[in-house]
Amino acid sequence: MTENFDKVTKKVEAMYMKYPYPSPSTESIQTNELLNLLKIFELENGIKLENVKFLDAGTGSGHRITNVAQHYSKCEFLGLDISEKSLEIANVLKNTKKLENIKFRKANLMNNISSLGKFNIVLCMGVLHHLANPAKGLGNLLGTLKKDGIIFLYLYGKLGGHKRMLNKKLISILLAKEKSNYGNGIKLIRELGLNKFEYGWNLNFKSNEEEDSLIVDYLLHANETLYDFNDIDKLFKKSDLYGYTIFGITTGTQGFLFDSSYDIRKKISIPQTNISKFLKSDFSLSYYKSLSLKDKCRVLDIIYEPNGYTIIGFTRQAYEKLSNERLKKNFVKIK
């Protein structure tokens, strides 16, 4: 099995060496999804992220994490990636922004990385689903968590990713034996008008080269696994975490904070999932109210059809410190 993992990892590495993601540009671009996520986490928990050690596992070309490091100047960051080309770009961005609180290094997440030390927060955003064995990769990442640490994951959604995967399959069939010919794949995608991006890929780009990287990651990726709620639950059950909660979901080009409640009284300016918009009568809501938390999550999964999930995994000590009522209400205990 190890040999197969190596083949997959090598394919992914070769792809990102040629098409760094999210951008081959060494210019700073507006990729603030990760920064906004952490700001919301601070706001809901009533905390300030200071003196925190972050591990960004699968940092790519560093555009997102350097924006984060610039904002959280009192925190330390280590960014890991399999692609040396991506890390070269990340280091240029680091130097351009004169950041002293972030370092980058090459690493394979399929290997034991515990020698890197312990971190308060591990970020693995849009990366785990590209590994040959996501469960093993998650285990390796958890080996770097402090006893009161948390991990943020972003995983592709199976239900909302259905059309994208059909388009990906179409291109794969057309390419036939040329599946690794990214240049021809990009040309086909443009000619068929399939370069219309969903959340995470719908970034501003200034050149065909920059769009090429988005196209490859979107429809030509060498390896990816998609998840629904049941798959997420199975993944976390195999881990050593105390439990997890779905922080948010994406559908199309829109993001929602995730909440299984049927009576959301706290009004915030950020869109949230809201079952009462779909189950409008007391009769239908009565059935929903009687469900377990997991079944409520399954119902929301089917209704919203996410193309992505942001999930937070908690150690026991981290959960005991948690003050965010929304996350507590939606917490799925494993142990």
Model-based region annotation:
Residues K98-M110:
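Conserved SAM-binding strand-loop segment of SAM-dependent methyltransferases
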Residues K18, S28-N51:
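Conserved alpha-helix/loop element of class I SAM-dependent methyltransferases that forms part
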Residues K136-K147:
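A short glycine-rich, Lys/Arg-flanked "PGG" loop and its adjoining helix->strand segment in the class I
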